[in-house]
Regions:
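Terminal amphipathic alpha-helical/low-complexity segments used for targeting or macromolecular assembly
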Residues: 37, 43-45, 158, 181, ...
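Short helix-capping segments at alpha-helix termini
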Residues: 66-72
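Short aromatic/hydrophobic "clamp" motif used to bind/position activated sugar donors
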Residues: 101
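Active-site acidic Asp-centered loop
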Residues: 104-106
Length: 254
């Protein structure tokens, strides 16, 4: 279910989608996920897998019947229970095969430059986004950006630490830091990490913790690609109007 907001104004269809918890299918002229899939295809990806829950057949039906993609092949993996983002990654293990693969949120519209750079990277990596650009160029408030994990890297641009905000050191004088919005290029090493980490306090398997484990325990080297770009995030009902306005001129090409 989308985060409630009494000040948000939604039409009847949008209200029904928000209540049903299908954030990615929020109608903003077209389902939001149409735009997400379009930009992933624009970045050069030709095989895409959506991880869905057992009660999310409407998503599968939509893309198999109403909006069948032509630019890429679309597969579905099933997460039996909502046990966290690392568990969702495990659900797609059979799809991933032996190659590098992209992992992103379905409720975030990332800049094509970031996705294309990861596609061309040829090694594990993370797209890091400067806090100032997220606030200035996307639809995220400073309060929300402050909750994202902070990225630290060495002089060679390799990820050294992924810190929760409460564990991060004081920011530099300008307050700008690189943060993670779950935009990754992984190898199969991540599956071992996802299986071996302990659940969080909420009982979920969290992807940031799996990344920390892969780096610290399994020797995975992850290249950090910094971007001064904004994203469009569809977390709460109050995001719908701003996201719809930003996507008004964008074309969907599935």
């Amino acid at each position: 279910m989308m985060r409630p907001d009494k000040a948000a104004t939604l039409d009847r269809h949008q209200t029904a989608v928000a209540a049903g918890g299908l954030k990615a299918m929020m109608p903003v002229r077209r389902p939001f996920l149409d735009f997400v899939l379009t930009v992933i295809a624009d970045a050069g990806f030709e095989e895409i897998c959506l991880v869905i829950g057992p009660d999310r057949g409407a998503i599968r039906d939509y893309y198999q019947q109403d909006a069948k993609p032509r630019r890429f092949t679309l597969s579905f993996a099933h997460q039996e229970k909502p046990r966290g983002t690392a568990d969702a990654v495990l659900a797609a293990e059979a799809f991933a095969g032996p190659d590098h693969f992209l992992v992103v949120n379905s409720d975030t519209y990332y800049p094509v430059q970031a996705l294309r750079a990861l596609h061309l990277l040829g090694e594990p990596g993370i797209a890091g986004f400067w806090k100032s650009a997220l606030i200035a160029e996307g639809n995220l408030s400073a309060e929300r950006v402050a909750r994202f994990p902070v990225i630290e890297m060495d002089a060679q641009g390799i990820l050294t630490r992924l810190l929760e905000p409460e564990d991060a050191p004081a920011p530099p004088p300008d307050g700008d830091v690189l943060v993670s919005l779950n935009c990754w290029m992984f190898t199969r090493t991540i599956f071992r990490a996802c299986r071996e980490i302990a659940p969080s306090r909420s009982g979920e398997l969290e992807l940031p913790e799996a990344v920390r484990y892969a780096v610290a325990r399994l020797g995975e080297r992850m290249r950090v690609l910094p971007f001064r770009e904004g994203v469009l995030d569809l977390t709460s009902r109050s995001d719908v109007a701003s996201v719809a306005a930003r996507l008004a001129g964008q074309q969907v090409r599935l």
